[in-house]
């Protein structure tokens, strides 16, 4: 509930993007630009991924802008 809700087509660098990756699992990343976001994988460490990748597109939940 902290920050402002942001529509996916209005994302800016630094916005937090949230994903539902399972029934009780959540994942968060930080938007960079041009569909890319930075996040940490327990198996691969720090990664850059794209919101348009099929996995992330289907798991996308919401975004927040913290000021």
List where the protein language model places each region.
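Glycine- and charge-enriched low-complexity intrinsically disordered segments
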Residues: 56-67
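A solvent-exposed, acidic/Ser-Thr-rich amphipathic alpha-helical stretch
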Residues: 50
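...with weaker cross-activation on analogous glycine-rich loops/strands in unrelated enzymes
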Residues: 1-45, 53
């Amino acid at each position: 509930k902290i920050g402002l809700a942001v529509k996916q087509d209005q994302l800016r660098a630094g916005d937090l993007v949230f994903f539902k990756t399972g029934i009780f699992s959540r994942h968060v990343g930080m938007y960079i630009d041009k569909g890319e976001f930075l996040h940490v994988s327990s198996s691969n460490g720090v990664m850059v991924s794209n919101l348009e990748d099929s996995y992330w597109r289907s798991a996308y939940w919401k975004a927040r802008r913290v000021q």
